[in-house]
């Protein structure tokens, strides 16, 4: 089942030759979750995403530099996340600056003068290269809000223009590529019209990441239960489909547009427990106290017997447990959102955030949400092939190094070492041959599955019930 394409005049249905970007947020606090749900960089499958966004760095009080990570664990995190490229050399590493609670004072100070912008731009390029990042994400929440003066709307464009120019003219170091510049934006009209010069910014960045979530929450007034990330809706423009159209009409080219997909739910406490239909009055946040409930927690609630309900008009699920109402996404709904990207040849998706998926597989298979996104983008064979190419390359590098060592041992007439290295080479070649056989079988199985078609789960099927 495919969504109605909203860009019919521009595009044909289906873009099978296109590769879609998968930007995946990984936040530093993922390390501090309890052991059952914490996600360390070493446990990330580096082929799930095309870009990793590490959040969030903070601009210091001077507006000229980023603050140093405040403890050893965070300092070491840069190195650990970048090491994923040893397994997948094509994985791009993006550093995100800002976020909800780390934006306002630093950004306003940064753009307060032309001199600050020029200094910061030169400094950040050196910083990104030193820490082996491939790009920068600007997540200012938001110009002209929370004490930011109205002039910051224009000055943010000045910052973006300067960064884009310096990124473009940078003399690229050996084995490096040009730095990527992305902008993460709130798509809602209440922010969009006041905070952003959309054309001015979008024309200079490589990608525009739209946060297609948190459309509703405990901050609403009047407070009523509503899903925070509906795909469609007939009675409100606050839905992914309509907001994407709005931003395209505002001047964002579709090949730059990245749609955000949440891996968390938003909860409410119902005013009256037996009045739980969408739009019912609420008195505050639910058990998450406004922080959001990760999928790796929600899946246990559903597996425990709480009935999953579905909003067909909005194409998203919700649950009611006592007086708590939770709107969230499941594998079906994120697959439909990814299909919207595929069907309209948008640039890709932004996952917020990777550590909120069921990455340990405690409710079933590992990475259920991320795999649903990959299938929705018709990128599963790309995912499989990337893993296989990397494994083959790794073995060939090991064999090459072993052969170099073997030549050295022979030159030194170290017969014991020669015999040992010859055996190692035979073992590696045998392992490679076995791995190639396994990979061929895995690819065959994957292709057979795709030939049968990967359809959306039935609406009545409860997620994580298998």
UniProtKB/Swiss-Prot annotation:
Cysteine disulfide partners in this protein: 24-49
Keyword Hydrolase listed: yes
GO terms of molecular function: chitin binding; endochitinase activity
Reactions catalysed: Random endo-hydrolysis of N-acetyl-beta-D-glucosaminide (1->4)-beta-linkages in chitin and chitodextrins
Compartment(s): Secreted
Coiled-coil portions: 395-447
Domain GH18 as annotated: residue spans: 20-380
Record Gene3D superfamilies: 3.10.50.10, Glycosidases (3.20.20.80)
Keywords: Coiled coil, Disulfide bond, Glycosidase, Hydrolase, Secreted, Signal
GO cellular component, one term: extracellular region
Active-site residues, as the UniProt record annotates them: 141 (proton donor)
Transmembrane segments: none
Free-text tissue specificity from the UniProt record: Prismatic layer of shell (at protein level). Expressed primarily in the mantle with highest level in the mantle edge and lower level in the mantle pallium.
Root EC class: hydrolase
Biological process, per Gene Ontology: carbohydrate metabolic process; chitin catabolic process
Signal peptide segment: 1-17
Principal localisation: secreted
EC number, as in UniProt: 3.2.1.14
Assigned protein family: Belongs to the glycosyl hydrolase 18 family.
This protein's name: Putative chitinase 2
Native organism: Margaritifera margaritifera (Freshwater pearl mussel)
